[in-house]
């Protein structure tokens, strides 16, 4: 499925980086190693908080570049610090973890990895969210910054964060002393590769970048029995089905039109055999919103509707509604985003830096921001430009993050990521050592 078309690719690379030949040469100098690391990581993904080999590979490479590296921060987290005279401390973060997804990209280096998920099930594992691109680009950026210390001053702090997909990894690192054992940064930087832009472009968003997220586990209680005698039972499967349908009215009938709100029931678990009515059913929900008041409205509505459906079904007791995870939206400091747009345009070309609206996905980088660290989180284009153009013309969507078919166009995406990160860091780290 992977295609390498040499002429368009070469033209794209030249277009992306032609605005700054120096950055282009620096990126080419580290590209081969970065791409080799990307392929290795893609073939060997690891689930949240089990990223032992991923973390070790990152730590080894950063040590080799002269960074002071600390492992096992917040579990499998990595912190690498490079001091270069007086000046600000700037943090650049990558995630380490992959997802329990069976890869179907057809790539020559597709993952065949398996692991045990938290409940103990054997699952396929894939870098279906692009964290392998993020790690490889961070290492390439780290190499450029280490080799060109005459172009900046201050302290560069690199973070390899575990458990982003569990939206708890950032908090674990903070709780383990991330900003007390190590320098607290003046600014934080991160990116995310997505197919919402073609490879070679980056997206800039001022203010709210993504959504609040809440994960709920709902247990509905019934009365089990024989499948041939449903009248002697209180069927939690039917209760679950009615609850799922009723929950769909929250967005369509309760939230003000125009407000972003998502209520997704992503998992349903009940029963063991066709002729056994179980005594309980479990739902897994994901809620998304931009505004705090909408977030609270969604949570309250889910609770009200779930309890009402259980009461209507004659449930023997109230449902158990557990808030198993949540995170606030990532907020891009507007003055910082405005400041960094210029260096990005200089490095990539003005046409390759676009303004983007907030996205509906979520992530826990917001926990770093909540520690009083103004930040800039931007989108890295990942789509093959030809496929992107064809999809836009046809009104179709390319495979998104978390899809088993998600396969960023790695070559131009990696080059663009490194050029962008270097440009941003040099701007914030202010020129030659003082």
What residue ranges belong to the model's regions?
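Bacterial N-terminal signal peptides
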Residues: 5-15
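Acidic/His- and Gly-rich active-site-bordering loop/insert found
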Residues: 19-127, 132-153
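Extracytoplasmic/secreted proteins, especially bacterial periplasmic and envelope-associated proteins
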Residues: 22, 29, 33-36, 40, ...
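Divalent metal-coordination and catalytic microenvironments
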Residues: 41, 62, 80, 92, ...
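Short, flexible, mixed-charge acidic loops at enzyme active sites
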Residues: 103-114, 207-211, 388-399
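Histidine/acidic-residue-rich, glycine-tolerant segments that coordinate divalent metal ions
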Residues: 114-126, 132-133, 145-267, 272-278
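Metal-dependent amide/peptide-bond hydrolase catalytic core
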Residues: 238-434
């Amino acid at each position: 499925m992977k295609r390498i078309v040499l002429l368009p690719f070469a033209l794209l690379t030249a277009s992306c980086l032609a605005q700054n030949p120096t950055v282009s040469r620096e990126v080419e100098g580290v590209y081969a190693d970065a791409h080799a690391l990307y392929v290795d990581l893609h073939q060997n993904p690891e689930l949240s908080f089990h990223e032992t080999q991923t973390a070790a590979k990152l730590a080894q490479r950063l040590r080799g570049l002269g960074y002071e590296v600390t492992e096992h921060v917040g579990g499998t987290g990595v912190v690498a610090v490079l001091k270069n005279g007086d000046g600000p401390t700037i943090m650049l973060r990558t995630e380490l973890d992959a997802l329990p997804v069976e890869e179907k990209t057809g790539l020559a280096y597709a993952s065949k990895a398996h692991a045990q998920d938290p409940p103990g099930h054997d699952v396929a594992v894939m870098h279906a969210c692009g964290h392998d691109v993020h790690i490889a680009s961070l290492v390439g950026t780290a190499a450029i910054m280490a080799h060109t210390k005459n172009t900046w001053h201050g302290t560069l702090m690199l973070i390899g964060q575990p458990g982003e997909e569990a939206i708890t990894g950032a908090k674990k690192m903070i709780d383990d002393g991330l900003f007390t054992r190590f320098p607290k940064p003046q600014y934080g930087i991160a990116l995310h590769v997505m197919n919402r832009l073609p490879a070679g472009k980056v997206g800039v968003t001022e203010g709210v970048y993504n959504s609040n997220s809440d994960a709920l586990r709902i247990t509905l209680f019934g009365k089990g029995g024989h499948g041939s005698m449903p009248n002697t039972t209180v069927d939690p499967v039917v209760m679950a089905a009615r609850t799922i349908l009723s929950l769909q009215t929250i967005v369509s009938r309760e939230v003000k039109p125009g407000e972003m709100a998502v209520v997704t029931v992503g998992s349903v678990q009940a029963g063991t055999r066709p002729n056994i009515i179980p005594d309980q059913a479990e739902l897994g929900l994901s809620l998304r919103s931009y505004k705090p008041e909408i977030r609270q409205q969604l949570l309250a509505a889910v609770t009200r509707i779930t309890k009402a459906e259980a009461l209507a079904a004659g449930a023997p007791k109230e449902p158990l509604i557990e808030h198993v995870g949540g995170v606030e939206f990532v907020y891009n400091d507007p003055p910082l985003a405005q400041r960094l747009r210029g260096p990005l345009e200089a490095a990539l070309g003005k046409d390759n830096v676009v303004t983007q609206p907030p996205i509906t996905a979520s992530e826990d980088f917001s926990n770093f921001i909540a520690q009083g660290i103004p930040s800039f989180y931007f989108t890295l284009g990942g789509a093959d430009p030809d496929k992107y153009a064809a999809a836009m013309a046809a009104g179709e969507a390319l495979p998104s993050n978390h899809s088993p078919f998600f396969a960023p166009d790695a070559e131009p995406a990696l080059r663009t990521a490194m050029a962008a990160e270097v440009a941003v860091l040099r701007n914030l780290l202010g020129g030659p050592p003082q």
